Amino acid sequence: MSTSSAPAAIGPYSQAVRVGDLLYTSGQVALDPATGQMISGGIEAQTVRVLENLKAVIEAAGTDLSNVVKTVVFLKNMGDFGAMNAVYGQYLAPNGVVAPARSTVEVARLPKDALVEIEVIARL
């Protein structure tokens, strides 16, 4: 599945794949959907863009962020964990909503030198 409301894939992969009643997204980095370029700004700005990209992908599949059951977060620097969490919580655990299961790992490098990449599994 694919939507123009999120950045086009930068490799041979799909934005998301449906398997039964689950949607598996590819990881999203902070690319502007209109230009395909990395946005400027720090971890907070990049996390917002990543989550907006993911929101566009899962909404195109007919679901929304409230149906996300699992995420994997890749950080270039674990020192950004707190700042990323502050933004992440606004999208995936607003107003005390139970947050999805999650793994977070630090990696040496991300595509386009992103600071954060997130992938999700959501119910349809």
Which ranges hold each PLM region?
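Short, polar/acidic, helix-capping and beta-turn segments at strand->helix junctions
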Residues: M1-L124
